[in-house]
């Protein structure tokens, strides 16, 4: 088992700073997912851990050893990329065994590792096939198997599902989850822009933006208690609805005014100094419901309906011209475009963010 420690890790290309002092402790056997928009630095951070990018500043430890200047081959890591990079003229067995043969491992040890990895990944029946006879998902599993055969201290995954279609992406994601369960003592670091992968695979998620960590936590912690406006809008699909608001009452509970001069009281404590402060009011689409009485947050007209079978998404245009709110309701719904609706939510499910975007608790 191997822990990974990042201490004030920085990366610059000339005068351009791309990673700004990242501090992160990854525990032994933990499955960590780096997630964020394009250009946030997640792949750069992974490549620095792998040794494929030089570290401009800070300290990287793997298994208690500082590895800043240790070459990639000596770090005890194995990496799986977006591209499978399989040798087309070699069988699955030979592709998985190739690295060990180059390292001059014993034939018996090579065979044991290949067959063990094939068993974990359900590839035993395909060992004699060429890559062209495999599906995209099976090819990616061969690439993962090749990494397993290295018997690494740490697995690094750089967007391994990006080249797969939707169905294969789901199937291969499940295989990676099974792999994590089958190898509970192996530390895994996974990069993706897909929050579904992050939410379903991770023990903890690291949300990155602009080369900085915005929040680290368990998937549901980030979903239910985002640290700031960026995380609130990035985690969750559809994204959290955000409305401009103003605090009018503070204390153990907070009252705000919303567009349409609606007043809403939230189960959030704020100090007296926040009175009259401009804030952002947030509510997730699935936490909104259609109000039947006079108690509601906002009202508007349904402009778009997306019936997805499992759920229905309503896009509600407010009477004051603000951005449409998205309402996520279960199953099929009887509403029509042009219907006027009033929306409400459980006060415990509402969020507030200050002018800098920091969550108010």
Q: Which ranges hold each PLM region?
A:
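ABC ATPase nucleotide-binding domain helices that frame the ATP-binding cleft
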Residues: 43-46, 142
């Amino acid at each position: 088992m191997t822990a990974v420690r990042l201490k004030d890790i920085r990366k610059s290309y000339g005068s351009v700073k791309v990673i700004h002092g990242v501090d992160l402790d990854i525990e032994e056997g933990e499955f960590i997912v780096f997630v964020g928009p394009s250009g946030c630095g997640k792949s750069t951070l992974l490549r620095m851990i792998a040794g494929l990018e030089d570290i401009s500043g800070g300290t990287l430890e793997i298994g208690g050893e500082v590895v800043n200047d240790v070459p990639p081959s000596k770090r005890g890591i194995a990496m799986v990329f977006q591209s499978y990079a399989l040798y087309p003229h070699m069988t699955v067995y030979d592709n998985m065994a190739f690295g060990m043969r180059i390292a001059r491992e014993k034939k018996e040890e090579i065979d044991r590792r290949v067959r063990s990895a094939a068993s974990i990944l359900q590839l035993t029946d395909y060992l004699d096939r060429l890559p062209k006879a495999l599906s995209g998902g099976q090819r990616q599993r061969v690439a993962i198997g090749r990494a397993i055969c290295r018997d690494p201290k740490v697995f690094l995954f750089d967007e391994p599902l990006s080249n797969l279609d939707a169905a294969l992406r789901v199937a291969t994601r499940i295989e990676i989850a099974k792999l994590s369960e089958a190898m509970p003592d192996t530390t895994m670091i996974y990069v993706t822009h897909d929050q579904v992968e992050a939410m379903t695979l991770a023990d903890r998620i690291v949300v990155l933006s602009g080369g900085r960590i915005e929040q680290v936590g368990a998937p549901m912690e980030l979903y239910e208690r985002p640290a700031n406006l960026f995380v609130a809008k990035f985690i969750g699909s559809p994204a959290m609805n955000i409305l401009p608001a103003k605090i009018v009452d503070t204390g153990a509970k907070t009252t705000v005014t919303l567009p349409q001069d609606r007043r809403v009281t939230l189960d959030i404590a704020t100090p007296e100094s926040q009175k009259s402060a401009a804030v952002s009011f947030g509510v997730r689409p699935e936490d909104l419901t259609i109000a039947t009485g006079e108690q509601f947050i906002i009202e508007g007209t349904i402009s778009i309906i997306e019936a997805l079978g499992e759920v229905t998404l309503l896009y509600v245009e407010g009477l004051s011209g603000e951005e449409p709110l998205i309402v996520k309701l279960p199953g099929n719904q009887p509403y029509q475009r042009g219907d006027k609706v009033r929306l409400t939510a459980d006060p415990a499910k509402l969020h507030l963010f200050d002018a800098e975007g920091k969550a108010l608790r």
